[in-house]
A protein has these predicted regions:
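Compositionally biased intrinsically disordered regions enriched in polar/charged residues
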Residues: 1-3
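A domain-level signal for the structural core that forms small-molecule/cofactor-binding pockets
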Residues: 5-276
Length: 276
């Protein structure tokens, strides 16, 4: 494994093309694009190096933002995630070594580096690496079309992008039916896809509302999230009963008091009957 992922000369040799951070780094913007005056590395330059470096190069080249809460699935191909897990496993081995944890003789730490890598890529941050779930829309234009409010309760698992601590909670998604309807399970799938990445609860509520509006063409959408945060429970203030609530209201949910009241009345009813 060490040999396979040995540092590539592109990044460590003065005789080869070099990665130029001031042209391709975090300060790259549309106002300062990469120019042909700089010798740009092609994809073949990365064939023997780290795949993660190649993907990062392409995103910087395209001025594609790749923050902890951004989806980057357009830059991944079949088999890429497994190779990225291999590379992250190697990096986690270094982290464990720096923490002075004996990975060789401690039976509980053997394989931990790979378990961490798989957990990040396949579970906690899977929403970054997977395309948005398919949400087939059906026309809502028959004579007896539904024009009322729909409220869906979705359980969420997310991760705080500051300390990489778990966030667990519930989202209540309200929508006034428009011209398109999606399956009930799709609301939860979309919400969970938005949640499984590094994010803030305030951003997550906005993300869910935006994706629901896009999938349904609805303009009247409400999202209410209540969650507990590991960064408050496991560190810092150690507040084990801490609860955070965020609300995003679009269209009539924001401008019409009766719609807003109906939404929160529905939430209260669901909370009263929800499993405990």
């Amino acid at each position: 494994l060490k040999k396979e992922f040995a540092p590539h000369p592109v990044f460590h040799s003065d005789t080869k093309k070099k990665f130029i951070p001031d042209r391709l780094g975090h300060n790259a913007t549309e106002s300062s694009p990469i120019t042909t005056e700089t010798e740009i590395m092609s994809d073949k330059d990365y064939q023997e190096g780290y795949l993660g470096d190649a993907i990062r190069f392409k995103m910087k080249r395209d001025n594609k933002r790749f923050w902890a809460g951004d989806n980057i699935s357009d830059y991944l191909h079949d088999g890429d995630r497994e190779r990225l897990i291999d590379e992250a496993s190697e990096a986690f081995e270094t982290v464990l070594d720096r923490l002075l944890i004996d990975r060789e003789t401690d039976p509980n730490s053997k394989g931990t580096a790979r378990r961490l890598a798989k957990m990040y890529f396949n579970e906690i941050m899977a929403g970054r690496y997977e395309p948005e779930p398919d949400a087939t829309a059906f026309p809502n234009d028959s004579a007896d079309r539904y024009e009322g409010m729909l409220v869906v309760r979705s359980e969420l698992r997310s991760m705080c992008s500051h300390h990489h601590q778990p966030v667990s909670g519930v989202a209540y998604i309200g929508i006034i039916a428009a011209q398109k309807l999606i399956g009930l399970s799709k609301y939860t799938r979309i919400a969970q896809w938005c949640a499984r990445r590094g994010t803030l609860q305030e951003e997550l509520a906005n993300d869910i509302a935006r994706e629901i509006m896009r999938a349904t063409d609805a303009t009247d959408v409400g999202v209410y999230i209540q969650a507990v945060h590991g960064c408050c429970e496991n560190r810092g203030i150690m507040a084990h009963s801490s609860l955070t609530q965020t609300t995003v209201l679009k269209g009539a949910f924001n401008t019409d008091q009766s719609t807003k009241k109906e939404f929160f009345d529905n939430i209260k009813l669901q909370q009263d009957f929800a499993p405990r």
